Amino acid sequence: AASVHYPIRGAVTFKGSVGVNVASDALANLASSGVTGGALIIVGEDYGEGSSIMQERTHPFAMKSQFWLLDPRPNLPSIVKAVKDGFELSEASNTPVMLMVRIRSCHVTGSFQTRDNQRPVLSVKEALSNPRSDFARVVLPPMSFVHEQDKVKNRWPAAERFIREKGLNEVFGPAGSFGIVVQGGMYNGLIRALQRLGLADISGRSEVPIYVLNVTYPLLAGEFLAFCEGKDHVLVVEEGQPEFIETQLGSFLYRAESGVKLHGKGIFPLAGEYTGQVMLDGVTGFLKVAAPEM
């Protein structure tokens, strides 16, 4: 709550769609009014093997309230970096950010380089001694109408600019006539499948072009279309249903009048966890279409 009026960072953790649903009223109001300090909602995406709740995704909640959604590659340096990026993205766009951590991401081991602690610009004690209020932040008409326009005219473009300039999404591999777009959290599974096919090594060096979406919402049309240049086929690896990312990327291609053939659900199953075998079967099926000579 302090992040709304003050340059104070705040974070909270929820378990998947259950915790987000319980807090949905407060979260929707937070997303409407916007924030001054960085606000980060860390969500344990409880989907697939090991889950203890209904099989739903966080993605549609982020879309309906315009929370920017981070889905970092499952290694400790990437996850730690995503926390820093999430706070900075929130502050740059005055919008709360969701950081999604999948079940398997929570079981990785490794190491990461730490940073020195930094004193906050404003402490909670200092904020309490000089309380602020802004009636325009109240989520009631007519202010709520202004909030909606601010989202699409100011906050969204600011978020896209930050994501693009900071390079939050990543591209790996050489140029080629086909490529793969993958949610950041599914990157390890994809690399393992390519490794089993002899198209990647254990360090992640890939012979296939890969566009990694460490930010799955919002998607950047220009960045995606640049990745598609010179390609005939592109595969979207999107776990869970419905296929929000695939649909949006298809819209980008349609509006650009691109001839790139987009693959996704159909080659991959519509629902369920993308286990090692499912990932291998899906990538193999795509390569039979996009690169039969391989």
Per-segment meaning from a language model:
Residues A1-E91, R102:
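Thiamine diphosphate
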Residues R73-M294:
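Flexible, low-complexity linker and terminal segments
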